[in-house]
């Protein structure tokens, strides 16, 4: 997002705004993706759910579940990362822990927060079709189902 502002030698305020927009849009998109990996389905996602878990990726839903979990639950997540033993049955257990602690909802809440920050960063720009398109891009990123 910031490249166009740099090329056109925009004001520092505009460069900073577009930097903030791009950063927060990216975070919002990724957080939504992290949540969808545990709540989506193959038909809507175009990929199997649980891929992040099965690949050993430590995403926010897992981090929050780990932090909130008891010793046994923490050990479960540690073993998944350290021992690299992951399968569909263990995924079901991970989802149960994640759901118990409400980490999907909290991850989505963070996505919405970053989406709001991204939109707020655009406040310095006049209302145009281009700004509107960027605002819709934020909306799509946080309400998407795939």
Where are these regions (language model features)?
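All-alpha prenyltransferase/terpene-synthase fold signal
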Residues: 1-146
